[in-house]
Amino acid sequence: MLIFPLLNDLSRKIIHIDMDAFFAAVEIKDNPKLRGKPVIIGSDPRQTGGRGVVSTCSYEARAFGVHSAMSSKEAYERCPQAVFISGNYEKYKAVGLQIRAIFKRYTDLIEPMSIDEAYLDVTENKLGIKSAVKIARLIQKDIWQELHLTASAGISYNKFLAKMASDYQKPHGLTVILPEQAEDFLKQMDISKFHGVGKKTVERLHQMGVFTGADLLEVPEVTLIDRFGRLGYDLYRKARGIHNSPVKSNRIRKSIGKEKTYGKILRAEEDIKKELTLLSEKVALNLHQQEKAGKIVILKIRYEDFSTLTKRKSIAQKTQDASQISQIALQLYEELSEKERGVRLLGITMTGF
């Protein structure tokens, strides 16, 4: 039974489409000899001195614990038999535009989240189809027949639940969460599977004895806000499936960044520079996925005494290149760093799109 019927617009029909291992799938489509093999999109660490991050990987590679944003070195250690392929982002962008064109056959209310995923509001759609399930199946069919790629689909009455649904059965899955099913669906879900709940937050929730959606549902809102601030308010709403943000076809992202808090204070300059390089590669990956390039690099450093400093640098030409971002970040570090102070957090952000 729903405990939050008045806090959601239950009439919306939202589809979340997420391409399955998109970059790897495009490469396998173009080279069928790769089918069935562990394929990793990213620099081969044997050729880069261990540098690089995984953009994505095939499900065969995921079986070895490889995942997006993992360092290429660790990916190789987990799966030495993998085929490493440097990303061809222009090719992926072209395929992404073909997928976007398929979406537009059904609705113009499309909110792309990256090159390989988007929300679609099909409450009112171009073909007058009443069933969101039918539309999702037609989209999956179109993508397969025209591009020989698979996509997973999630359907619900808001974006949060649609995203949770698309993640539930992959690859090539289709999951529907009806209003009367939402509470039970979220209750049984591991808290680490909640969209928008990061690793550090999961660890803190575990310390509170929260491991599932059912556990989270029992925590009072005031307790969550006291422990997590604004995030606590969001967690309280997620436990109840509340998400009122509409699908925004003109969504504009103003910045893309990555930051990491270190459990062990970083003191060695070599370690700090290594982490900055890795963060730069992750930011570059996100830029490619979001089809963005920026002209401003922002470095953030939080020291062991919790004091935080930021410094930015503008460049003449927009970039999404990992090596260029890394070079600028390292330069900013040299200008900003107080070498005798330990570092507990590093962050790199690109803006100026």
UniProtKB/Swiss-Prot annotation:
Answer yes or no on keyword DNA-binding. yes
Coiled-coil residue windows: none
Q: Where are the transmembrane segments?
A: none
Which Enzyme Commission number(s) are listed?
2.7.7.7
Occurrences of domain UmuC (ranges): 14-198
Among Pfam families, the record links this protein to: IMS, IMS_C, IMS_HHH
Protein name, entry field: DNA polymerase IV
**Organism expressing this protein natively:** Streptococcus pneumoniae serotype 2 (strain D39 / NCTC 7466)
The uppermost taxa in this organism's lineage are: Bacteria, Bacillati, Bacillota, Bacilli, Lactobacillales
